[in-house]
C-alpha cells in the first residue's frame, strides 16, 4: 500500500485505534502485543515525520519500513471476552494481596481487599464464585488469625497506617467469609483437590481474529464486529430482575455502599422503591423501610443544600408512618437498638407464634432526625413568606409520628424494661414536650385534637390520657414523667420547659418558685449550649410574666441579666452578631447558626427591650430624684443601659418627636422626671408595641397607674426639703390617686427609710423632719472629699503600676546599723520617706489622706 494515504499526521492511526475498541465494550486493558505494535507504529510515524523533508520522488518509494508494516498486519490479534477480562483483573488484585502479605503491608491489603470484593460482584453476574477468590479469602483469614497470635506474644507494635488497615481487615474478613462459608469449608477440607477440580463453567477459548489493515479497520467496523463468532456485545445498564428472594441481597449491597464515594443514592432509593413493590413478608417490608429511610437521610447529608428537600422529607415522613403501621400490626417483629443483624441473605427468619424477632434499628432516631431536618429547613426559609407557613404546617404530621413513636416505644418498655429502652422513651417524650411548651393553650388544644383523630383507635398510652386536650394537664404529665424516669440534662430541660409554660400563661409565682427550688441558676454553666439557651428563654419569659402582673421590680431584676448585656439575640439564639474583629472560627460560626431557633419560636426583641426600659424607668427616675436631693446617699445605678440612653438624649441640642419604641420610653422618662405624669402616661401608652401583648388595654391601665405612683414618689423626693408638712388631699388631687393609696405609698417610703417624715393621721398630712438632710454647703464638702479620695486612690494605683517590682524599695524595714538607701549608715532614714509618728512607716497604696484641713473640719 502506498504511504501517500497516511499523510504527515496520525489522524488515521488514532481513528484506527478507536475502532479497535469495538471488539469488546468492556475492554479495560490492551494486550501486550497490541501495545508493542502501537509503540512500533508510533516510532514509524516519528520516522516518517523526520523524512518529511526528502525529495518528492523518494516519498512514494517503498522502504524497508513498509515491508515490516505489511508483515505486522499479518499478525493475529487475540480477542478476550468480558468475563475473562474480569477474571484477569481479579487475579492481578489477588497477586497484589499476596505480595502485601509477604511484607505485612496491611494498608495495601485493606484497600485491595475492598477492590477485590467490588470485582467479585461483577464476576458473580456471569458465573459462580471463582475458586481463586475462595482460596484468597480463606488464606487471608488464616493470616489474620496468625498475625493476631503474633501480636499477643510479641511486644512489637505496628505503625499507625498498618494498624488501621489491620483492624479494618480483621472486622471485614469475618463478616465477608460468612457469605462463602460452605465454599471455604470445602477448600480447607482438601485444598489441592478443590483447586484442581474442573470449574463449573468452562472458560471459552479466545478466538484469534486476523489483524486488519488500518484502512480496512476504518472502512468496515461493522463487518469486524459481526465476525466474532461465539461472542456478543455486552451492553451496560442491563435491567435487573427484582424478586422477593433477592431483596435481602440487594439491601446488603446498598448498606455496604453507605459512606463510600461516587455512590448514586438516588438510584439506590429507586431500587428500594421497586423492592417495596415486590416485598411479600412483613420482615422484608420492615427491612426495606429501615434502609430506605436511612438512605434518604444520607442523601441530605452528602448534598450541598443546607437542609433536606421538602420532597425527600415528606417521603421519609410517610415511609416512617407506614413502617409504624406495619410494626403496630405485626407485633412479633420488633425494631430495637442493639439487636443482632440477620446474616443469611438466602433465607428469611422463621418466627413461630408467640415468639419475637428483633430487627436492628432505631425508630426514635428516625423521628428525631425528621424533627431536626424540619427545624433546619425552618431556619433557612424566609419567615415572612408563604413558604414558611406552608413548611410549618408539616409539624402536625411530625407531631403525630412523635406520639405514635412514643406509644410504640412505651409498649416495648412495658414488655421488657431496659435502660436503653427507657432512655429512648425519655428522648421521644422530651421531643414531644419541646414541640408544645412554648405554644399558647389554644394552639396546643387544636394540635392534640388533630393528633388524637389521626392516631389509630386501638393505640393506648399510660403516660398521657387520650382525648384529654387540656394543655396544662398535658405539659404537667409529660414533665412529671421525665422527673421520675430521667436525670441530668433531660430532667433539667423538662423543668425549664414547665417553668416557661407557666410563665407564658401568667402563673408568675409558681414559675418563680420552681426556678428557685430547682437551683438551675447555680448549675446552668455546666450544661450544654442548647440547655443554656432554654434557660435564658425561660428567664426572659419569667420577666415578661412579672411585668404583665405589674411586678416592676421583679421584672427589671429578672430581665437585667439578659437585656443589660446588649447581646439578647445571641443569648436567646435568635440571631448572630458578627463583630468586626471577631475571633470566632468558621466552625464555631457554623455551630452557632445550627443552634438558632426557628422564627415562630422567637421572643419579640423590640417588645422585650421596651419592657426592660419601661421597668428601668419606673425604678431609675425616683432614684435619680432621691440622690439629687440627698447627696449624702451613695450613688447607685440600677440600669446602665437606661442611664446611658437618657444621658445621650439629654445631650442632644434638638430633640424631635419619638420615632421608635426606645425614644418613646426615654421621652416618657423625661416627662416623669419633670413631674408631668400625665404627659408621661400619654407618651408611654402611645407606643404601639403594647398591642402585641395579650389584653393590651389592661397593660396600658397598669402602666398609667404605675406612672401615677412613681410620679408621686419622684415629687416627694424632689420637694421634701422645701416642705414642713404636706396635705394628703393635695397630693390626691395632683396625682389623681385615692388618699388611702397615697397613705400606703408614703408609709412604705417611711418604713424603707427613703423619706424622713411622719404621717399625721389626725390632720391627714405628712410632717417632714428637718435636720436630717445636709445643708447645701455640707453636701458640697462631702462631694469634694469623695472626689479627693478617689483622686488619691487613682494616683497611688498608677504609681504601683509604674513601679511594679520596685515596690520593695519603698517599704524596707530599717534595723539598727542597716543601710538606708543612699543615706548614712546606721539609723538614717529609709529611702521610702519619713516615718509617721510612732515609728510606723508610710505604706504606698493605702488610703492615708485624711482630707487635710477640710477633712479635719468635717471630722470635728
UniProtKB/Swiss-Prot annotation:
Keyword rRNA-binding listed: no
Is Protein biosynthesis included in the keywords of this UniProt record? yes
SUPFAM superfamilies given in the database record = Winged helix' DNA-binding domain
Regions of compositional bias (Acidic residues) in chain numbering: 10-51
Query: Which regions are flagged for Low complexity bias?
Result: 832-846
Describe the family membership recorded for this protein in Swiss-Prot or TrEMBL. Answer: Belongs to the eIF-3 subunit C family.
Name the chain's protein.
Eukaryotic translation initiation factor 3 subunit C
Which source organism does the UniProt entry give?
Answer: Emericella nidulans (strain FGSC A4 / ATCC 38163 / CBS 112.46 / NRRL 194 / M139) (Aspergillus nidulans)
